């Protein structure tokens, strides 16, 4: 793995790390520029952990500049460059001297102009950055970039009030300010505050000792980059689960960050309203769904009556009102979706503005609905977004994938997981994260397989997707069918999908080793973070959030007028969702029957058979013994009045499920059999949506009952056979079970076809998850189930 993207793991640290990285540099032909400065040198520093930050707040940093008190954020505005500690200067050698000379040069931006075209066109890969663009980043005195290690100046101390030389966002730069002469578009990648690109050169050998102040009495606390880690975690996969929850709570947006973003939106909305009073500005993307990181951008769409999007007109108005930095406004009129990209002048928040794109607003509502369905989805998304963001793989523009593609991949992963019901909130997040990396880093066939989200989700051949595509494009490497726009490939522009696959594979290797039993023998197992092996937070992000909380602390409560449209939409969506959930199947019978299934085999086969055909080229071993964990699911069915009359009224009522006084309860179980006899009145009963059971009595009750597939509908009309399609009845008549694909017989009806509520998934534990693939093998044998009978 490229050491500029991957990191040296804690148990691998040693004196040979720096030598090995120099050998790798030579073998890859990654040389130093003419100045002697390494193009892969990291421009951010890892964040202090919680305990270290509190202990180091009140003392000097031992050569890295005065430390920032925990409650005092760095002030905005241009700041003076910081000095390097002597220990780190010695460790870096000629690289530091070359950077020092570059900082003195007055023609910095002009000397690096040759690299701007590639950076702006997006053709530059995340792993290849020119030395001139890296060097141009060094002298920037504000914006959270540069840091204590990279703003080199002869004897210039850190500016008062800065956190180790990492200033917060700056305000408008005055005339003649150095920042106006040192800005260059070639620094696009280096303006990512969360980037850990090249961090290994700060964590290896003597550089790591220099980073902590040389180990002397005035040494600064170590910087592991895991500020969310404030306690000891359980060993193995359970500890990773606990750490993901802590990371989510630490990185989730705070009210001050939301207030800051609303203020940015308000400024842009004011400019739009001045131009077009009838225009409507709406928010979509991560700010609308709440799945945004501290440095995420804001997506806006302007609705109005134009024949062509007025990109240039809005660009001129934004420049006139000084809303954005002049050099940051870019008009991408040749893109698939023409947009205006800008960076807010005051907050440095990046904003994307599009025109009349309804799909963005619909996509935000689509994601919100799935967040309600899968409560674990936000945790996975926030971890995955941080994982790609710090490697500059979070945008198609920089050679990665879009956030929308990532979210659809996560939804598909949860939909088609063969072993768990992702709608449950008690699943292990650590296991889900490792399996996500395994699927998309190792097992998924990017060449032949596409991803479908609608209709329960499926993996389909790209040839099938190509038949439905209306734009004339061929399926891309990462082919994701748009669930909202038929014929659109969401991953069409993700030309760097294979780089994302590579880092997913790297993360799977690292995490699977970290949670293995062997990891318990590591000498530093208690001090190191498992999630911190693949994710780190930079000090620049921490300082940026401090500055936000200080400045917008009094504005944290949203104004009613700002979010009125969003709140109304959410209220409407919530009401629609409640109506959908509360909708019951229509039936000519008026009484309800609460059915409790305590046998996991009653629901498992229908669930698994319906999703077999959607797993293309995959392997799931289903020959292993079934899971014995009991699962009881309750759902409502319509029962005929004559049948209810034959049931005793003294049967127990399930706890927590209030029913009308006319309701009766039927409990079916395969563990403890109860018998009762139904009197012999003649019954003319239509089929009801429940499983057929043998009933002993003088009269023959023969009704066909259909059971719908509760989890994932089949993508193929020919599902594989299931061992549970026939139940051997030991007590009563021997009757075959009908299929579960909505067919009817004799005037019967299917619960799904009639708008019925799908029952929850039964226990899918008998399909064990095989790490080597995702295929399901055909069942060639049958299993006898325990008898199911009803009697007094």
UniProtKB/Swiss-Prot annotation:
Q: Where is the PAP-associated domain?
A: 428-486
Any one GO cellular component localisation term in the record: nucleolus
Name of the top EC class for this enzyme? transferase
- Where is this gene product found? Cytoplasm; Nucleus, Nucleoplasm
Q: Which keywords appear in this protein's UniProt record, sorted alphabetically?
A: ATP-binding, Cytoplasm, Magnesium, Manganese, Metal-binding, mRNA processing, Nucleotide-binding, Nucleotidyltransferase, Nucleus, Transferase
Protein residues bound to Mg(2+): 297, 299
List, alphabetically, the CDD domains matched.
NT_PAP_TUTase
| Annotated stretches, region: Disordered | 55-191, 601-632, 737-792
Q: Where is the composition biased (Basic residues)?
A: 764-781
The EC designation for this entry is: 2.7.7.19, 2.7.7.-
Q: Which GO terms describe its molecular function?
A: ATP binding; guanylyltransferase activity; metal ion binding; poly(A) RNA polymerase activity; SMC family protein binding
**What does it do?**
Terminal nucleotidyltransferase that catalyzes preferentially the transfer of ATP and GTP on RNA 3' poly(A) tail creating a heterogeneous 3' poly(A) tail leading to mRNAs stabilization by protecting mRNAs from active deadenylation. Also functions as a catalytic subunit of a TRAMP-like complex which has a poly(A) RNA polymerase activity and is involved in a post-transcriptional quality control mechanism. Polyadenylation with short oligo(A) tails is required for the degradative activity of the exosome on several of its nuclear RNA substrates.
Q: What is this protein called?
A: Terminal nucleotidyltransferase 4A
Sorted alphabetically, which SUPFAM superfamilies does this protein's record hold?
Nucleotidyltransferase (SSF81301), PAP/OAS1 substrate-binding domain (SSF81631)
Composition bias, kind Gly residues: at what positions? 744-756
Pfam families referenced in this protein's UniProt entry, alphabetically? MTPAP-like_central, PAP_assoc
Q: Which organism is it from?
A: Homo sapiens (Human)
Query: What are the BP-aspect GO terms?
Result: double-strand break repair; mitotic chromosome condensation; mRNA processing; negative regulation of nuclear-transcribed mRNA poly(A) tail shortening; polyadenylation-dependent ncRNA catabolic process; positive regulation of 3'-UTR-mediated mRNA stabilization; response to xenobiotic stimulus; RNA 3'-end processing
What family is this protein classified in? Belongs to the DNA polymerase type-B-like family.
Comp. bias regions, Low complexity: 80-97, 105-139, 601-619
């Amino acid at each position: 793995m490229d050491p500029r993207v991957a990191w040296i793991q804690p148990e691998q640290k040693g004196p040979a790390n720096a030598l090995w990285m120099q050998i790798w540099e030579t073998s890859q032909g990654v040389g130093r520029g003419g100045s002697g400065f390494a193009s892969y040198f990291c421009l951010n520093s890892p964040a202090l952990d919680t305990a270290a930050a509190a202990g180091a707040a009140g003392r000097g940093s031992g050569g890295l500049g005065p430390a920032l008190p925990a409650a005092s954020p760095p002030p905005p505005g241009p700041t003076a460059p910081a000095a390097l500690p002597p220990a780190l200067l010695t460790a870096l050698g000629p690289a530091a001297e070359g950077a020092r000379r570059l900082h003195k040069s007055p023609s910095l931006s002009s000397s690096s102009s040759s690299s701007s075209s590639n950076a702006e066109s997006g053709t530059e890969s995340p792993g290849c950055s020119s030395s001139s663009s890296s060097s141009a980043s060094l002298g920037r005195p504000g914006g959270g970039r540069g840091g204590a290690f990279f703003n080199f100046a002869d004897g210039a101390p850190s500016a008062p009030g800065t956190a180790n030389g990492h200033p917060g966002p700056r305000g408008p730069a005055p005339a003649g300010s150095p920042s106006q002469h040192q800005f260059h578009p070639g620094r696009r990648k280096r303006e990512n505050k969360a980037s850990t690109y090249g961090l290994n050169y700060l964590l290896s050998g003597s550089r790591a000792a220099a980073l902590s102040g040389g180990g002397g009495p005035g040494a600064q606390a170590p910087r592991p980059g895991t500020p969310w880690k404030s306690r000891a975690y359980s060993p193995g996969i359970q500890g990773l689960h606990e750490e993901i929850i802590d990371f989510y709570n630490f990185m989730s947006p705070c009210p001050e960050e939301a207030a800051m973003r609303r203020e940015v939106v308000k400024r842009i909305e004011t400019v739009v309203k001045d131009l077009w009073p009838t225009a409507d500005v709406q928010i979509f993307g991560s700010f609308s769904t709440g799945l945004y990181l501290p440095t995420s951008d804001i997506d806006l769409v302007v609705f109005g009556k134009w024949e062509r999007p007025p990109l240039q007109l809005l660009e001129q108005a934004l420049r006139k009102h000084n809303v954005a930095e002049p050099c940051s406004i870019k008009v991408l009129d040749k893109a698939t979706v023409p947009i205006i990209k800008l960076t807010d002048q005051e907050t440095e928040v990046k904003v994307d503005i599009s025109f009349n794109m309804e799909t963005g607003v619909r996509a935000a509502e689509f994601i919100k609905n799935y967040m309600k369905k899968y409560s674990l989805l936000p945790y996975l998304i926030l971890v995955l977004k941080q994982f790609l963001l710090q490697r500059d793989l979070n945008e198609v523009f920089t050679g990665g994938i879009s956030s929308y593609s990532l979210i659809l991949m996560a939804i598909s992963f949860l939909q088609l997981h063969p072993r768990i019901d992702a709608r449950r909130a008690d699943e292990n997040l650590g296991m889900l994260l490792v399996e996500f990396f395994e699927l998309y880093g190792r097992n998924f066939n990017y060449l032949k397989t596409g991803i479908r989200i609608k209709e329960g989700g499926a993996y389909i051949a790209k040839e099938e997707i190509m038949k439905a595509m209306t734009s004339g494009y061929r399926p891309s490497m990462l082919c994701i069918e748009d669930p909202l726009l038929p014929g659109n490939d969401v991953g069409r522009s993700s030309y760097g999908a294979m780089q994302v696959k590579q880092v997913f594979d790297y993360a799977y290797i690292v995490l699977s080793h970290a949670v293995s039993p062997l990891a318990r023998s590591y000498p530093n197992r208690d001090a190191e973070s498992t999630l911190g092996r693949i994710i780190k937070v930079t000090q620049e992000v921490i300082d940026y959030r401090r500055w936000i909380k200080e400045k917008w602390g009094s504005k944290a409560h949203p104004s009613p007028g700002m979010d009125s449209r969003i709140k109304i939409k959410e209220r409407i969506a919530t009401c629609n969702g409640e109506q959908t959930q509360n909708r019951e199947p229509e039936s000519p019978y008026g009484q309800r029957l609460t059915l409790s299934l305590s046998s996991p085999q009653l629901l498992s086969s229908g669930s698994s058979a319906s999703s077999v055909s959607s797993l293309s080229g995959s392997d799931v071993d289903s020959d292993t013994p079934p899971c014995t964990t009991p699962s009881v699911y309750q759902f409502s069915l319509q029962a005929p009045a004559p049948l209810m009359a034959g049931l005793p009224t003294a049967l127990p009522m399930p706890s927590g499920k209030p029913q009308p006084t006319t309701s009766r309860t039927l409990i079916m179980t395969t563990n403890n059999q109860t018998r009762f006899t139904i009197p012999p009145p003649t019954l003319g009963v239509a089929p009801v949506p429940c499983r057929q059971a043998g009933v002993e009595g003088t009269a023959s009750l023969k009704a066909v009952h259909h059971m719908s597939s509760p989890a994932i509908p089949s993508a193929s009309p020919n599902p594989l056979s299931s061992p549970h399609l026939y139940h051997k009845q030991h007590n009563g008549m021997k009757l075959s079970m009908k299929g579960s694909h909505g067919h009817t017989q004799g005037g019967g009806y299917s619960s799904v076809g009639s708008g019925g509520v799908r029952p929850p998934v039964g226990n899918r534990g008998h399909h064990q998850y095989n790490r080597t693939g995702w295929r399901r093998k055909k069942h060639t044998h049958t299993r006898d189930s325990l008898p199911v009978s009803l009697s007094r």
